[in-house]
């Protein structure tokens, strides 16, 4: 009789262990699915934002923004030797950017800038000022990841 009792207890313990293991596996799988869904939502949101920024970069307001960025950068990078990097699509605005900068500078195309804006580098001052829409979008993505309340527990 005692052997039967221990056998039943062992079987029950094994069943509980198996059930707990299955629940844990299912919970892990559902969390993984939820994480993938969250990533998909986030990627969609930021792809749409990128598309809107690319459309904005075709407007007159964008040219005004480039001028503002160039003017702001010139107040920070006061020594000579500044290089302003822009995206390929903005090559037509080089003269406008130079004029807004107000000092002698080089303006070069950078393949790393996909959306737009200005990346200013002054090696003499050891400073970089990033006013690219690319970096601003990435900053928003980081902020969104931290503050979106799309946490997975």
Residues covered by each model-derived region:
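Charge-rich, N-proximal long alpha-helical rod segments
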Residues: 1-21, 25
């Amino acid at each position: 009789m005692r052997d039967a009792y221990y056998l039943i207890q062992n079987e029950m313990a094994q069943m509980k262990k198996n059930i707990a293991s299955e629940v844990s596996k299912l919970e892990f799988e559902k969390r993984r699915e939820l994480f993938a869904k969250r990533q998909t939502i986030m990627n969609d949101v930021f792809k749409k934002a990128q598309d809107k920024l690319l459309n904005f970069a075709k407007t007159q307001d964008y040219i005004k923004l480039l001028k503002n960025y160039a003017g702001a950068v010139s107040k920070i990078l006061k020594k000579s030797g500044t290089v302003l990097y822009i995206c390929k699509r903005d090559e037509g605005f080089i003269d406008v950017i130079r004029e807004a900068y107000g000092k002698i500078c080089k303006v070069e195309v950078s393949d790393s800038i996909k959306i737009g804006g200005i990346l200013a580098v002054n090696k003499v001052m050891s400073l970089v000022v990033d006013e690219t829409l690319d970096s601003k979008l990435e900053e928003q993505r980081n902020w969104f990841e931290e503050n979106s309340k799309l946490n997975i527990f």
